Regions:
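Short glycine/proline- and aromatic-enriched beta-strand/turn motifs that initiate or cap beta-hairpins
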Residues: 22-71, 77, 189-193
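Extended low-complexity acidic/polar segments
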Residues: 126-167, 190
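Cleavable N-terminal export/targeting peptides
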Residues: 1-30, 193
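Residues that define the transmembrane beta-barrel architecture of outer-membrane proteins
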Residues: 29-31, 48-54, 85-93, 109, ...
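Extracellular loop and loop/strand-boundary signature of outer-membrane beta-barrel proteins
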Residues: 41-44, 79-86, 133-139, 171-175
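Gram-negative (and chloroplast) outer-membrane scaffold detector with strong preference
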Residues: 57-132, 190-193
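Predominantly the C-terminal beta-signal and adjacent terminal strand-loop region
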Residues: 77, 152-193
Length: 193
């Protein structure tokens, strides 16, 4: 009888003091693949000056939920000229570090602020210097470098799947076109280990 009371007391105390387990997310060493798309310099889908970008990143989590990222991006921005668009494309590689600014207790929503170094190539009108009306472009293709500051939000919809939203400002030097680009983007992240 004494053993029975002891077992009941043990079971009651375990039921009383056991906390709820949360998902194991953003642990050091975990990696994820991010695929993103963004509108560049505004939300203009029509017209001659709308821009967009696509990118993929590998992110690796460190202590406190912070993360390193390494990846690449393609950005296309059209510059208006009479009735046509002159494409300006940038192909960049990037590496950066993102600090966890905020997260909820259940580890579903995360907010990050990060900085990245960028390097790549910029091409104007795909290298063609003469326009349809005989005008010549003075802007030339060039290797570019610079950086970006990013504000990212991750919302986990499953343990290995997150939806992403980002606001980003890129600054690249050595190109002949616009130096700063603001990006508003969405994406998806797959945790791979």
């Amino acid at each position: 009888m004494n053993m029975r009371k002891y077992m009941i007391a043990l079971a009651a105390s375990l039921a009383l003091f056991t906390g709820r387990a949360n998902a194991q997310r953003c642990l050091p060493g975990m990696q994820g693949i991010e695929v993103k798309a963004a509108m560049t310099d505004g939300f203009r889908m029509s017209g001659n000056d709308g821009g967009h970008s696509f990118g993929a990143l590998l992110s690796t989590y460190t202590k406190n939920g912070n993360k390193w990222s390494l990846g690449g991006e393609y950005l296309l921005k059209n510059s208006p000229y009479n009735d046509v668009k002159i494409p300006v494309a940038q192909f960049t590689a990037e590496g950066g570090y993102h600090f966890k600014v905020l997260s909820d207790a259940r580890k579903i929503v995360f907010l990050y602020a990060g900085v990245s170094a960028l390097a790549g190539y910029e091409t104007v009108n795909w290298g063609d210097k003469v326009l349809y009306d005989g005008a010549r472009l003075h802007d030339s293709d060039a290797f570019v470098y610079g950086g970006a500051v990013t504000l990212d939000m991750e919302v986990y919809v499953a343990d290995r799947l997150a939806l992403l939203a980002s606001l980003r400002e890129r600054c690249l030097w050595e190109g002949d076109t616009r130096k700063l680009h603001t990006q508003f983007g969405i994406g998806i992240k797959f945790i791979i280990n």
